[in-house]
Amino acid sequence: MTHFTEPKVIYQEANPYGTFTAYLEDDGRTVYLYLQGEQNPEFGIKSVWVCNRVEAPDKRSAEDLSNGLAPLLLHSEVNEPKPQPAFEEKELYFIWTEEGDGVALFYKEVLVAFLPSWSGIKGFHGYSFHAKIEALTAYPLGNSDFGIIPDRVRASRNFWEARSKQGAWKEIQEKRLSFLESKFGKHDKYWSADGGKYPQLGIARFQSEKFPEILIYSTIGMSAQNMPTVELFHKDYEDYARIELILAVKIGLEGLERSESWVPHLIGELIRFPWNMAKWFGHGHTITMSRKDPEALYLNFTSVLFRDFESFSLLNVPDLSGFISENGKQVRFLTLLPVSEEEKEYAQKGGIQSFNRMWDEKGFSWYHNSERQTLI
């Protein structure tokens, strides 16, 4: 009969965003690294085998599986079949990925495991220094100092060190405000939008002489860190991972302040979404509107469509290209276009290119008009 002890969490830590928690668990047989989402129940729990704490067996035990025990790696799957000693908590620490949905485990300053954002896809778990071959719950990490994984972890360490420097947020904030003010003129309102949590974020409002009929609201700071999971969809993910959102609204009959009742709140609910949910925003994406437009006249706007400013064929669209983030990559500015349920379904079925072409042909603009007619 297999003897086992109650699993013990020997190290635990939340990511800097406060949205994911990683913990290291030792059940006397194995040590596993786990990652769970705090705000997205769909994320579930991801895991990677770190090491065996008992002699590596030649085959897996059906009894272990029936008892719900974490799988051991076999003699043929590990670098060292002998039991690994217990970890000393004081020698453990995590380095989180910039995106916050992946974590590296260090022990005595050595990288021993990495649980990346693509963990959980097609049966993949993560990487372990003690894995010899591609096994059930771990792939080999290889060299802990050189290679793609160590380089990536090193880049994450450098990112967090840079962000922890005094004055880092002020530089980030001023750089973005300066760029937007070169396009729209001085901002006339600013809200802190991070709720006192990391990352620091804000919303700025502009009344531009170039666009006197509209109010322009922009996020400040989203582009200072990569969004999660972009690399699952784009090989050159760093070209898509940094964005700022803009929601511009045509000034209605009720004046400037009417938009204040919903626009900053809507943006405020979107601004942390990527890091809260481990999801990303990109050109052609849609998301349900959490706030209603009180000035909507003909349409019930239920979703917002994200559209890259560079995709418009219209005249009089601001040129927001050329802004480079701290990582040397260009920032993509996405405008938020409220759409009806019918318009959203049309875009999803017919394709975003067809939808955008029709939008431009009908002369709809890059900003939101509460009184517009339906596109379809």
Regions found by a protein language model. Give the residues of each.
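Short linear motifs embedded in intrinsically disordered, proline/glycine-rich low-complexity segments
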Residues: 1-376
